[in-house]
Structures are given as C-alpha cells and as structure tokens.
C-alpha cells in the first residue's frame, strides 16, 4: 500500500481497501490496520454475515428442544422426589420451546404461552427445579423476589427491573434474553391483603400483580442499556417479553385450609390439627388445588389466568431428605467430601447421622433448604481444626455427633489414634 501524496491525481499514492479493492475516494471511511485497510462497506458486509450466522445457529438450537422424557431424566439426576411436579414442568417447558421453534412457520393457529405456577411448602425444591430447567435448556435464567417489588413510582424495585436482570444474564444479547426463563419467588406474598376495598393503595400486593400482568402476557419493555435510572435523552434497548417463560413459586401458607374448606372434608379445627401433626397432609391437599382457591387466597383473576400450568409439590419426609443428602450429582454429602478430599482426608457419614440430620430439618420445618446450615454447624469445628492437624486420614460422623453428645472421630494414618468420641 502506498501513501497519499500531496499532489492531486497521483494514483500510486492512493489507498485501497484490502478486501474489495475500492479506493479511499470511492468509500466513506477507510480504516487502517498494521498492514491492511478495510472500508466501511466491507465492515457492514461482515456484520451482516455474523448476524445471519447467529440467526441460523439460533434456529438450530430451537430445533434441538429436548423431549419431556429427556428433561425429566435430567431433573431426576438433580431433584429427589416430586415426580408429579417434574412431569408437569417437563411437558410445559418442552411445549414452550417447541412453540418458539415453529412460531415462524406459516400457521393459521397461534400457540399461546403457558406460564407456570409452583405451589409447595418451604424447602421442597421449587427454586431448584426452576434453576435446573434453565440449565437443561441452556437459556438465560434469573430469580426475582416478589416481596421487593412495588408499583412503578414507589420506593422499591420496579417490575421492569426483572427484564433488566434477564438482559444482564444474557450479556445484553436481546435475542437470547427474549427466550429466557424468569423465576419469581414468594409470589404468594403479593396476594391482595383483604377482600374489602381500602382507602390506602396496596402498592406491594395487588398493585404488583397488576404490574406483572403486562410483562407476563407479552409487552415490549424499554430497558436502559447499562441499567440505572431512565431519562428522556437516553437510548433504550427494546425487549419483547412475549416468548419469555415465567415461573412463579410460593409456599402459600394457609391455602390448604381454603382447599379443605371447599371440599368440606374436615372441620376447621380438625384441619388445623391435621396440619400440625401430619405435615405431608399439606402436599396431599395441594393436589386438589383449583384456580378458585387461588382467588380466595388473594390473587386477582387476571394474574391467575396468566399462569395456566399449575404444579404442586409435596412436603419432603425424612427418607426423601436422606436421599437429597446423598443421591443427586451435587448432593451435600458429596460436596463436603470433596472439600475434605482437598485436605487428603476422607469424610464418612454413618446412616444414623444422615437420618439425624434429616430429622433436624423436618423438626425445623426448613425442608431441603435447611440441610446445609445443619451440616455447616456439625462440621464447623472439624473444618477449623483440620488444616493444622497432621496425619488425619479419615473423619467419621455418627448420629451422636449430630445430636451434640459426641465429637467427630479422627482416624490417623500412621497410628490408629482416635481423637474425639468424648462427651460434649
């Protein structure tokens, strides 16, 4: 390439695009590299090629929607129990992304979106199910807490911030964000406070339900490119929420009494006794859930109508919690064993220890969510001491350790010396 001369018509000193061969006088801009030049027209052509490749790869991914059986199989690897809920979710998610894969094809029938409502007690796996689903489909996924949401204009988190978080999870790729999954937790906390009209505005209850209606049904949300507050001179990213799958979850405390009253199966007093004595009764009652029960609970009809797929989850009993501790691919016991393995120490749990941990979670009514905190409390002293101890090859946790009546058993490599097993 030659330099531009001061003289007017010397073609030897004119710069040319290294790709298309056009001179600097035939294009608007010529960008110089270390040894090459590229014009603005070639840059635009390259961008068009990249966009087409992105579209074609997206079409391929849409056609590769896993079957309900495949989704269920992966859920079984990570989530223990909840067979009915997993079947409902597998079919709903498969149909949703199958709908996206074929919506561009000519069809007289428009397939509506089916958002999902998960109803189940605390710690039964609602959030974990949604997270696992997003991992299976490989789409952007975010969690939002309904208790922090308020109507636009009030102190609190705006509903449109949900879309902003999803866009951030997709690295500001609008196309990917528009096919993502949003999980809204604690949705039962935005129920209408009472059936009676009030002179004060319910900005965190019914008002939030009204605000969520638009984005759940499908609207074009204007989101600031890098977050922050909106102002008139700012350019916005337009995100269409029509194809975003919304999954709402909540414990719905007290909903079982509404369902029981509708069925006239028990008296109010007897129903309360059953709830306190037999926790599994709650999960069984939830199986009889009807939309009218959600209306009585405090959800508005329009909001319930946006959640046509309802999956109910059961309480986790001791046996299920023991399975959760040991069987999934990322089970808690396996996680702590991996931590101890980094210190070249084998961590062993006796069967009675696992059942004692599960019993504590049932007593505390925290479900699977409380298992980690119980494990942390049991292993805290051991994890504190272990890095400074020499020769320990095995740590054994028994049921007495969980109950607090004994310390973990330390087995040393050279001498079969034991530290622990001493009354606390």
From Swiss-Prot:
Domain ClpX-type ZB, chain residue ranges per copy: 5-58
Pfam families (alphabetical): AAA_2, ClpB_D2-small, zf-C4_ClpX
Residues at which ATP binds: 121-128
Positions that bind Zn(2+): 17, 20, 39, 42
GO cellular component: HslUV protease complex
Keywords assigned: ATP-binding, Chaperone, Metal-binding, Nucleotide-binding, Zinc
Cited InterPro entries: AAA+_ATPase, ATP-dep_Clp_protease_ClpX, ATPase_AAA_core, Clp_ATPase_C, Clp_protease_ATP-bd_su_ClpX, ClpX_bact, P-loop_NTPase, Znf_CppX_C4
GO molecular-function term, one example from the UniProt record: ATP hydrolysis activity
Superkingdom in the source lineage: Bacteria
Biological processes per GO annotation: cell division; proteolysis involved in protein catabolic process
Family membership: Belongs to the ClpX chaperone family.
Classification via NCBIfam families: clpX, PRK05342.1
Its biological purpose: ATP-dependent specificity component of the Clp protease. It directs the protease to specific substrates. Can perform chaperone functions in the absence of ClpP.
Family matches, as PANTHER family: ATP-DEPENDENT CLP PROTEASE ATP-BINDING SUBUNIT CLPX-LIKE, MITOCHONDRIAL, ATP-DEPENDENT CLP PROTEASE ATP-BINDING SUBUNIT CLPX-LIKE, MITOCHONDRIAL-RELATED
Oligomer status and interactors: Component of the ClpX-ClpP complex. Forms a hexameric ring that, in the presence of ATP, binds to fourteen ClpP subunits assembled into a disk-like structure with a central cavity, resembling the structure of eukaryotic proteasomes.
Stated name of the protein: ATP-dependent Clp protease ATP-binding subunit ClpX
Species of origin: Brucella suis (strain ATCC 23445 / NCTC 10510)
Taxonomic lineage from the root: Bacteria, Pseudomonadati, Pseudomonadota, Alphaproteobacteria, Hyphomicrobiales
